[in-house]
């Protein structure tokens, strides 16, 4: 059981051991309920037909929300990124989940992601702006540049700003982060 927990992202050997020992101390009905919940989630949760976010319905809650701005489309790598943006309660547009990032080293090319459906959606739905919200990494930058080149004939393309986290000290920031913070600067209001 410990080996299975260690396969989960963010779970190391000590946490895996704690989880396993905790479960072994639980009553059998709670363990069965936990196992049933895992199996139910696996069989009932799929992808939204429009944005590819996780959903138990053909359309996710965001795609069904009539109050969302249909002209803005935020592109994210996966549902975790979408949920992080939703926690801000600032973005009111639609989303498109790629299902990963272009990574030749890992054997992931553009054809393995939800890029063709993104192009179709932008063209079909008359999106006025696509916001690329991809991680500031080699893979994220590669994917952003690739998408920007494909999307510019159809619509305006922007990328979220990157810089220093709130509460951080300049002296501890690396050069790339500082460069991006300077490039993404805005006028004081």
UniProtKB/Swiss-Prot annotation:
Organism this protein belongs to: Prochlorococcus marinus (strain MIT 9313)
SMART domains membership: TOPRIM (SM00493)
Keywords annotated in UniProt: DNA damage, DNA recombination, DNA repair, Metal-binding, Zinc, Zinc-finger
Gene assigned in the entry: recR
PROSITE patterns in the cross-refs: TOPRIM
Domain Toprim as annotated: residue spans: 71-165
Identification of the protein by name: Recombination protein RecR
Keyword set includes S-adenosyl-L-methionine: no
Annotated GO MF terms: DNA binding; zinc ion binding
GO biological process: DNA recombination; DNA repair
């Amino acid at each position: 059981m410990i080996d299975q927990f260690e396969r989960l992202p963010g779970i190391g050997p000590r946490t895996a051991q704690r989880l396993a020992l905790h479960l072994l101390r639980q009553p059998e009905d709670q363990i069965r309920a936990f196992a049933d919940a895992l199996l139910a989630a696996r069989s009932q949760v799929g992808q939204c037909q429009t944005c590819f976010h996780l959903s138990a319905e053909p359309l996710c809650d965001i795609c069904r929300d009539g109050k969302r701005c249909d002209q803005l489309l935020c592109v994210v790598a996966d549902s975790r990124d979408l949920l992080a943006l939703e926690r801000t309660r600032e973005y009111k547009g639609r989303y498109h989940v790629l299902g990963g990032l272009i990574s030749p080293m890992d054997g992931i090319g553009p054809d393995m992601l939800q890029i063709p459906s993104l192009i179709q959606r932008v063209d079909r739905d008359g999106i006025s702006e696509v916001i690329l919200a991809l991680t500031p990494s080699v893979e994220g930058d590669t994917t952003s540049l690739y998408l920007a080149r494909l999307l510019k004939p159809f619509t305006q393309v922007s990328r979220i700003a990157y810089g220093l986290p709130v509460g951080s000290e300049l002296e501890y920031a690396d050069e790339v982060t500082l460069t991006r913070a300077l490039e993404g600067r805005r006028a004081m209001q």
